[in-house]
């Protein structure tokens, strides 16, 4: 797996810091992990696919050596972010190997076909929609809400306790442009990401006197592995939805992962 990122456009020293990145083998979060690692942090990637994480870690490590002439500490851990006991067990291992958490990036998330409508808007004629709001699968809705919202809340509960004692720490939640402006089709995903934004605001207040910072970023549109089929046809040409997105984007293109570093 080849990962290509630009050189870090800033100089920050994170030596002695431990960063945990959930969803760390994904397109966007692996770019963020790279930025943390070449800045000196020890990085723990959390994901569900061990083989994919190994490929990402190998690529990031090699690129850091080639482009930055730096030796990095990046390790992978398989964990279910919606299972608190799994998170607790994983954190015990991370803490023993890399130290307690200083930086947490909550990037685990995703969508499910059963939680997406086929049409962007309800047809004028009743009964002509292939898969409308009323057809959404209850189980898939719960899965999307759990992965995105609970998969953000639970890691914060588990990984940030040590920050309180240190009176220092940074939590960065990955929301979405759909947190602010609900997008057509992806009703459940938009609601889950909106919940993350509200959670972030609540935690920023709750942690306000503790030295722990909690912020969120709301990325726009990026061509990533999980949305590839939504944005591109089998021949590589953009889908009508992709063309519509680009037409409504001032820069006239999708974002690049390294722009989030």
Segments predicted by a language model, with ranges:
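Substrate-binding pocket helix/loop in short-chain dehydrogenase/reductase
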Residues: 115-133, 137-142, 245
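Residue(s) in the substrate-gating loop at a strand-loop-helix junction
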Residues: 176
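Active-site helix of classical SDR
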Residues: 156, 192, 200
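Conserved glycine-rich cofactor-binding loop
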Residues: 25-26
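Conserved glycine-rich Rossmann-like NAD(P)H-binding loop of the short-chain dehydrogenase/reductase
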Residues: 41-56
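A glycine/serine/threonine-rich, flexible loop-to-helix segment
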Residues: 10, 117-124, 209, 221-249
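Alpha-helical segment proximal to the catalytic Tyr-Lys
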Residues: 161, 205-206
């Amino acid at each position: 797996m080849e990962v290509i990122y630009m050189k870090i456009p800033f100089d920050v020293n994170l030596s002695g810091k431990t960063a945990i990145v959930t969803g760390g083998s994904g397109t966007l979060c692996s770019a963020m992990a790279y930025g943390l690692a070449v800045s000196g942090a020890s990085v723990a990637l959390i994901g569900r696919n061990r083989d994919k994480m190994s490929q990402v870690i190998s690529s990031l490590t090699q690129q850091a050596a080639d482009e930055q002439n730096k030796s990095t500490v990046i390790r992978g851990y398989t964990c279910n972010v919606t299972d608190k006991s799994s998170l607790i067990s994983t954190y015990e291992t991370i803490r023993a190997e890399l130290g307690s958490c200083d930086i947490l990036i909550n990037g685990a998330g995703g969508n499910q076909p059963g939680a997406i409508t086929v049409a962007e808007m309800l047809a004028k004629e009743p009964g002509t929609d292939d898969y409308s709001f009323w057809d959404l699968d209850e189980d898939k809705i719960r899965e999307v809400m759990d992965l995105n919202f609970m998969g953000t809340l639970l890691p914060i509960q588990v990984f940030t306790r040590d920050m309180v004692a240190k009176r220092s720490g940074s939590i960065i939640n990955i929301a979405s442009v759909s947190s602010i402006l609900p997008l057509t089709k992806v009703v459940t995903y938009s609601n889950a990401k909106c919940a993350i934004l509200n959670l972030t605001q609540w935690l920023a207040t709750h942690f306000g006197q503790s030295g722990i910072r909690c912020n969120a970023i709301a990325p726009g549109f990026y061509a990533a592995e999980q949305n590839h089929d939504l944005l591109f046809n089998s021949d590589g040409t953009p889908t009508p939805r992709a063309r519509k997105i680009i037409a409504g984007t001032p820069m006239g293109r999708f974002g690049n992962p390294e722009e989030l570093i």
